[in-house]
Regions:
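Conserved, well-structured interaction surfaces
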Residues: 1-40, 60-68, 76-89, 242
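Elongated scaffold/linker segments in the mid-to-C-terminal portions of large proteins
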Residues: 123, 127-130, 134-242
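Short coil/linker segments at helix-helix boundaries
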Residues: 14, 42-66, 114-119
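TPR/Sel1-like alpha-solenoid repeat signature
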Residues: 26, 100-103
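Short coil/turn linking the two alpha-helices of tandem helical-hairpin repeats
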Residues: 37-44, 87, 106-115
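Structural recognition of the beta-strand scaffold that forms the well-ordered cores
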Residues: 4, 36, 44-46, 157-161
Length: 242
């Protein structure tokens, strides 16, 4: 909110630049507010005037559910109207596609209490899948999770988070999903914190490439094979989402 005020005050910015930056900020605010709303319910939203007086104590009430949804919807609708199209947006930056995807998530969230939101979901989803948006399914589902499978050429990705592969880093995901007794593929064991489900695994037919990175068996440190028939403590819940 404060950033939006500063953008409007910036006399050195053209109206076109102001519109672009406002759309990016409102998309970011819509994204963050949706996450907070999803986890905690309606939140407190301070006005620009209240933010300009941080030392003045003033109890603020949470927004109502309807006000919260409208607040997020307004930001994302503005962003969808003013952000560049996916083909014109710089890789990794916000685009119309992301704003519309977030609106779909918001509307799906609300279908629990109001089924009419499905109509909005359908309209936006059809728009997102239209040829004018430039998205398409990847020829290889597993490749999207492999080195080289991402990047601007992958038209299935709606919003990418670019990383510098030259920097020193490590794979946190494997540490969260690998079992504590994992001893396979030359990889270390992990924290055993996350699983997929057998229900999801069984939704794909045998030979479906979407099972490729759902590991349904592994060799433990004591040499036994852990799988659905011999689940131990980890595979009872489902396969490992590698």
């Amino acid at each position: 909110t404060s950033v939006l005020a500063e953008i409007n005050k910036a006399s050195f910015l053209s109206d076109t630049k102001k519109e672009k930056y406002e759309a990016e900020v409102r998309c970011a605010r819509g994204l963050i507010c949706y996450y907070l709303y999803d986890m905690f319910g309606p939140i407190v939203v301070a006005t620009e005037e209240e933010l300009d007086n941080p030392t003045q104590e003033k109890p603020l009430a949470r927004l109502s559910k309807e006000e919260m949804v409208k607040y997020i919807e307004t930001d994302l609708t503005y962003a969808a109207a003013h952000l560049p199209s996916p083909s014109e947006a710089e890789y990794g930056r916000f685009s119309k596609g992301l704003a519309k995807m977030l609106l779909i998530r918001l509307y799906l969230h609300e279908t629990v209490s109001d089924k009419s939101y499905y109509d909005k979901v359908e309209t936006l989803a059809n728009d997102l899948m239209s040829s004018s948006m430039g998205y398409s399914l990847s020829d290889s589902y597993p490749k999207m999770f492999e080195v080289g499978g991402q990047g601007p050429d992958n038209k299935e990705i709606i919003w990418a988070l670019p990383v510098n592969t030259e920097m020193v880093s490590w794979n946190d995901w494997h540490m969260f999903v690998l079992p504590t007794d994992f001893d396979d593929h030359g990889m270390p064991s992990g924290y055993e914190s996350l699983n997929s489900t057998w229900y999801f695994y069984d939704s794909f037919e045998d030979g479906d490439t979407r099972r490729t990175y759902l590991v349904d068996s592994y060799k433990s440190k004591n040499g036994t094979i852990v799988n659905r028939e011999n689940p131990g403590t980890h595979m009872e819940l489902g396969p490992i989402p590698m």
